[in-house]
A protein has these predicted regions:
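Short, structured helix-loop element that forms part of the nucleotide-activated donor/catalytic region
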Residues: 54-60, 233, 238-266, 270, ...
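Donor nucleotide-sugar binding/catalytic pocket of nucleotide-sugar-dependent glycosyltransferases
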Residues: 67, 148-198
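Acidic anion/phosphate-binding donor-loop and adjacent secondary structure
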Residues: 76-80, 174, 181-182, 189-205, ...
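Conserved donor-binding/catalytic core segment of Leloir-type glycosyltransferases
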Residues: 200-218, 223-228, 240
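Aromatic "clamp/platform" in nucleotide-sugar-dependent glycosyltransferases that forms part
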Residues: 272, 291
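Short hydrophobic beta-strand element within catalytic cores of glycosyltransferases
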Residues: 308-311, 321
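Conserved acidic donor-binding segment of nucleotide-sugar-dependent glycosyltransferases
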Residues: 323-324, 328-335, 344-349
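A short, well-ordered alpha-helix in the C-terminal region of glycosyltransferases
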Residues: 337, 344, 351-366, 372-378
Length: 387
């Protein structure tokens, strides 16, 4: 396979410009940084358009050019939308990107509109089809129809492609009317297998870990309910919950509810955790009871750390948690089934070790950031060559 470090695309003077468009700077740093580094090392001039909070120094330290965009996540207010579109149009005009990589649904729709009439290749990353596809309520169904009507003409055009992380998300986009030829699949955003390395288990008590936003869609309430059932059977297990509420998401847990979990026996809500590898050093088993994922970074990081895993049997999670190989799967939203899976692994150190070793091997072979970076840069190159 091509060594990106030794075959840059062009000279410093005329490097192709790559613009990432994502709603939050922290999301770029947590999920897109490995592929952006791969693109930089392959010869791209990398720009990042995002809502700037605390990530400016880290992004600029990578040699990327940062552009502040007033994204308002969760808002469809006309004025806010127009302000975001205007800012994106200005950035597109100033940067004149050869490739624009939109991340998530809001950035994709607004970004594609902003690129109309521009000569740029568009990679539109769907990183797990969230609330509109996981909820059965009337509002979500209506939103799905609207999304399909808007996306079809925007994505189905020359130089534009939808990027998904699992086959089921590809099928969902096809069901919205997006042609298969306009869809590419790359499994996740990559995990640094040199930073996240196999860790020895800590002494008892047996500890379960959850890393993610505190959303119903992530199954955090199902996890708490299952843990209560487990403790009710006499288990001395512990549960570490790492993550914060997301007020812009209609499925978010409130901070008051999250604080209340700290008062329950065995549960510790940690809030935001910067050192995720350190958390997996404390936990024996990773748990993610999500309703749907693209490809969950928290499980990929746990796998790289050699941790056995438990996850709901849903798109995205299935790619990382292979039942009876890297962990256990259970029916979505089924707290008793989750409690049974937790109890099984709590009592089986040899099984945990076997699953953890297989998980590490899977992370190295399929999800390593170097591999994902190469695949992403190859996609950019292919689209540029066809332009």
């Amino acid at each position: 396979m091509t060594d990106l470090r030794t075959e840059p695309l062009s000279t410093e003077r005329n490097r192709p410009r790559l613009l990432y468009v994502t709603a939050e700077d922290w999301a770029f740093l947590s999920h897109r940084l490995p592929m952006a580094r791969a693109a930089r090392d392959a010869g791209f001039d990398v720009h990042v358009a995002t809502r700037v909070q605390n990530g400016r120094a880290a992004i600029e330290a990578e040699g990327f050019t940062l552009h502040a965009i007033p994204f308002a996540r969760g808002s469809l207010a006309p004025l806010a939308t127009l302000m975001t579109l205007a800012a994106l149009r200005r950035v597109n005009s100033d940067v004149a990107p050869d490739v624009t990589h939109h991340v998530a649904l809001q950035s994709t729709i607004l970004g594609l509109v902003a690129t109309l009439g521009r000569r740029t290749v568009c990679v539109n990353a769907f990183i797990g089809l969230g609330y509109a596809f996981t909820s059965a309520c009337a509002k979500a169904r209506a939103l799905r129809l609207a999304i399909g009507a808007v996306l079809r003409p925007l994505v189905d055009r020359d130089g534009s492609i939808a990027l998904v992380q699992n086959a089921e998300d590809m099928a969902a986009l096809i069901s919205l009317g997006i042609p298969k030829r306009r869809i590419a699949l790359i499994p996740g955003s990559g995990v640094d297998v040199n930073r996240f390395t196999p860790l020895p288990e800590q002494p008892p008590p047996l500890t379960f870990g959850f890393v993610g936003r505190l959303l119903d869609d992530k199954g955090v309430r199902t996890l708490v309910e299952a843990f209560r059932l487990l403790r009710g059977r006499g288990s001395d297990a512990r549960l570490l919950i790492a993550g914060t509420p997301d007020p812009a998401n209609p499925a978010s847990v409130t901070e008051v509810e999250a604080q209340s979990w700290n008062k329950e026996p065995g549960i510790t809500w940690l809030g935001h955790v910067g050192d995720v590898a350190g958390l997996w050093a404390r936990a024996h088993v990773a748990v993610l009871p999500s309703r749907r994922e693209g490809l969950p970074l928290s499980l990929m990081e746990a796998a790289a750390c050699g941790r056995a895993m438990i996850a709901s049997d849903v798109p995205g999670c299935r790619e990382v948690v292979i039942h009876e190989q890297t962990g256990l799967r259970f029916p979505v939203d089924n707290a008793p089934a989750l409690a049974a899976a937790m109890e099984r692994l709590a009592d089986a150190p040899d099984l945990r070790a076997r699953y953890g070793a297989a998980a590490r091997q899977l992370a190295e072979q399929k999800f390593a950031s170097d591999l994902i970076g190469r695949q992403t840069v190859e996609l950019y190159r292919r689209l540029l060559a066809a332009r």
